[in-house]
Amino acid sequence: MVSIRPDEISSILKQQITDYDQSVSVSNVGTVLQIGDGIARIYGLDQVMAGELLEFEDGTEGIALNLEDDNVGAVLMGEALGVQEGSNVKSTGKIASVPVGEAMQGRVVNPLGQPIDGKGEIPTSDTRLIEEMAPGIIKRRSVHEPMQTGITSIDAMIPVGRGQRELIIGDRQTGKSAIAIDTIINQKGQDVVCVYVAIGQKSASVANIVEVLRERGALDYTVVVSAGASEPAALQYLAPYTGAAIAEHFMYQGKATLVIYDDLTKQAQAYRQMSLLLKRPPGREAYPGDVFYLHSRLLERAAKLSDAMGGGSMTALPIIETQAGDVSAYIPTNVISITDGQIFLSADLFNSGLRPAINVGISVSRVGGAAQTKAIKKIAGTLKLELAQFDELAAFSQFASDLDEATQQQLERGKRLRELLKQPQFSPLNLAEQVAVVYAGVKGLIDEVPVEEVTKFATELREYLKLNKAEFIEEILKEKKLNDGLEATLKEVINEVKSSMLATV
């Protein structure tokens, strides 16, 4: 028979009384009523707040969007293969946040900030809410510093400043992403942190872009946020806000940042899909009523901060895809009205061989003029007007048999200006090279050069300056002005290159 020792029992009881923890954990738990198409209807989450993160029992996360009388409509941020009718759902009391910090540079992440490039975890402890309020009026200052894209036609005619929102708009396959990638490549050595947000794109396209950035040494200062075409609509909807949050971290540290949203049309379509499945009333083109707010609250986060706030900036280049050049559709008109100007790319110009295919007539930068460097502003003032007039004359001259000499001369110069502004992909030019090329065209110094030789002339001019006039390039890059001495040097170089070229033609 087992002997019972009272002292042992009392010591066990004492131990249990000492270790007794009477803390009670209260969690708000609900039950899945219905699930499908990335949407869950949940009963019982009485205390949940709009936009709150939810946790399903298989670990999938969701966001509560519709708070109704008898149920909550939530979107799922994953496959949710383990979630079924009757599954438990817990509210977390948190809003979606994303990891931020220096360690994010050079990495490819999903909209939740999780790495998807196979390089392991990101060593950062800082986080930031995905949805943040935009800086107020007092925290901002006007745009006054240039954000050089390296693309001559943009920097000369549609300049972009740090803290500006400049829309890139055009049909599919007209070179919208190419302009954005060139701008990222041109920030090398400028101490600008870039964030490229790919929304609803093919995984192969994103992999190709990452490889291009890596080859040109641009991935070191770039964060790529990707929500592929196969991802749930909720992740495609969140991706731009994640990109903005990552850039905001650097902006509030006083750094210049550049964010590319490629493209917001697909984000709007993902949001429309979610809204219709949540049974929200459809409006124009079946988009929900708050689709304007979807984009305005995102793009308002781009700003040039005041000196008291550290002087950082976030420049946003949203991309919008049009159908058959129709800029009067719902989403294009919304984003045009929110942004500080647009760069319009034309399929006709692209197919005619003009690349970048910028339609100068309807492209505009509303605030970038104040940020343009004096060197390029001095010589490019008439460039936009001349090209716009050339387009009109070119259309008119197709029907006119005999043209007067002045018109003929204007047409010839316009053709040469067009050729000068052609630029291959992934080859951004610095300020001095742009000044030299534009000066040669605007001042009529290459009117004698045959049109088909203009591109070759521009290349030779740039090479000559690099080899023989390095001090000219240094002076322009340092002073950002074209004084009389530099202008005389430039004219001399242009004439020299032109003479040697015409001698061989």
From Swiss-Prot:
It catalyses: ATP + H2O + 4 H(+)(in) = ADP + phosphate + 5 H(+)(out). The record marks 363 as: Required for activity. Gene3D superfamilies: 2.40.30.20, ATP synthase alpha/beta chain, C-terminal domain (1.20.150.20), P-loop containing nucleotide triphosphate hydrolases (3.40.50.300). It is an enzyme of class 7 (translocase). Its EC number is 7.1.2.2. InterPro entries: ATP_synth_asu-like_sf (IPR023366), ATP_synth_asu_C (IPR000793), ATP_synth_asu_C_sf (IPR038376), ATP_synth_F1_a_nt-bd_dom (IPR033732), ATP_synth_F1_asu (IPR005294), ATPase_a/bsu_AS (IPR020003), ATPase_F1/V1/A1_a/bsu_N (IPR004100), ATPase_F1/V1/A1_a/bsu_N_sf (IPR036121). One of its GO terms (cellular component) is proton-transporting ATP synthase complex. CDD domains: ATP-synt_F1_alpha_C, ATP-synt_F1_alpha_N, F1-ATPase_alpha_CD. GO terms for molecular function: ADP binding; ATP binding; proton-transporting ATP synthase activity, rotational mechanism. F-type ATPases have 2 components, CF(1) - the catalytic core - and CF(0) - the membrane proton channel. CF(1) has five subunits: alpha(3), beta(3), gamma(1), delta(1), epsilon(1). CF(0) has four main subunits: a(1), b(1), b'(1) and c(9-12). This is ATP synthase subunit alpha. It comes from Prochlorococcus marinus (strain MIT 9215).
